[in-house]
Amino acid sequence: MDRAGALAAFEAEDCSTPRSWGNGPGDAYGRHSHERHKVLFCLRGSIVFHLDHADVELAAGGRIDLPPGTTHGATVGPEGCECIEAWR
């Protein structure tokens, strides 16, 4: 999925205003959760989401949905990543 496709998906699913972000290789986010449903697309590079039941690797074009209260962390892949996300 490219940026235009992600934006179209956010609009079709009545999501909030999207936010883009990126990180360098190996950057990590500690385990946390959100009160709202997060929809996230990886646009460039890769990122691994660490969920309670499994690790989910997103490469460019990948999507992950994180329902409210889903505990997760993440580690950015070796080439960094660029992502876009919104709340649903």
Locate each region found by the language model:
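Short histidine-centered beta-strand/loop micro-motifs
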Residues: L7, A28-H34, H50-L51, T75-V76
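Short, charged/polar surface micro-motifs in flexible loops or helix N-caps
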Residues: C15, P25-G26, R44-I47
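Conserved short histidine dyad/triad with adjacent acidic residue
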Residues: T17-H34, P68
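A generic "binding-loop/recognition-motif" signal
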Residues: P25, E35, A54, T70-T71, ...
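Short, conserved beta-strand element in jelly-roll/cupin
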Residues: S33-F49
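Short acidic-glycine-tyrosine-enriched beta hairpin
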Residues: H53-P68
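Ligand-binding loop in jelly-roll beta-barrel domains
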Residues: P68-R88
